[in-house]
C-alpha cells in the first residue's frame, strides 16, 4: 500500500495531536501544517514525526 499513516506533533509543546495519511513515494519530505493545539490553545506548526 502506498499511503502510510503519519503522526503530526506540535512544535511548541511536542505533543502528538493529529494523525493523517500521505503517499511517501510522491512526497518523501516531512509534512508541516499550521493546526490548532488544544494544550497550547492556539494555532501552531505541526510537523510529521516518525
From Swiss-Prot:
One family name in Pfam for this protein: Ribosomal_L33
Domain of life: Bacteria
Keyword Mitochondrion appears in the UniProt entry: no
Keyword Iron: no
GO annotation, biological process: translation
GO cellular component labels: cytoplasm; ribonucleoprotein complex; ribosome
GO MF annotations, alphabetized: structural constituent of ribosome
UniProtKB keywords: Ribonucleoprotein, Ribosomal protein
SUPFAM superfamilies membership: Zn-binding ribosomal proteins
InterPro entries membership: Ribosomal_bL33, Ribosomal_bL33_CS, Ribosomal_bL33_sf, Ribosomal_zn-bd
Record-stated family: Belongs to the bacterial ribosomal protein bL33 family.
NCBIfam families reported for this sequence: PRK00504.1 (NF001764), PRK00595.1 (NF001860), rpmG_bact (TIGR01023)
Protein name listed in UniProt: Large ribosomal subunit protein bL33
UniProt source species: Aquifex aeolicus (strain VF5)
Name of encoding gene: rpmG
Amino acid at each position: 500500500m502506498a499511503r502510510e499513516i503519519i503522526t503530526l506533533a506540535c512544535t511548541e509543546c511536542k505533543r502528538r495531536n493529529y494523525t493523517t495519511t500521505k503517499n511517501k513515494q510522491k512526497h518523501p519530505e516531512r509534512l508541516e501544517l499550521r493546526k490548532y493545539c488544544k494544550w497550547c490553545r492556539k494555532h501552531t506548526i505541526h510537523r510529521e514525526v516518525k
